[in-house]
């Protein structure tokens, strides 16, 4: 994404948010301490009400640990990371999601044609052309059908109750002369 229009500003904004977020700071320090120093921040656990809960333990290298149990802390942090990725899909979707990339509107923005899209997919130029100029959206749909889309929508849905919308499926193609 480096060099992408607006990415640096977007990323800087998110870095500032992460720097002020207690869980983000903790997990950044957690990684540093566990990987580079070798300290395990596991503090212990408890069993009550038929539940086992584990907690982080503080140390001189990791003095500030979450009060919540490990599972809750990890889920909350993971959700914030998923939110960041979801935002990236919304802002930069055409650069990271083939379903958003291979659209007429995106290729117009790029100054490219459907034949350029065909070529990018390794197909001969004009491969989807059936001789009907009104069938261009069907051509785009055929190209999108050869690609993957947002393959983490299930994660967005599970953690955020949101999904990245794909192009609506077109009704069956009917030639004008039918």
Predicted regions and their residues:
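N-terminal ordered "arm"
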Residues: 1-2
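Acidic, Ser/Thr/Gly/Pro-rich intrinsically disordered interaction regions
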Residues: 5-178
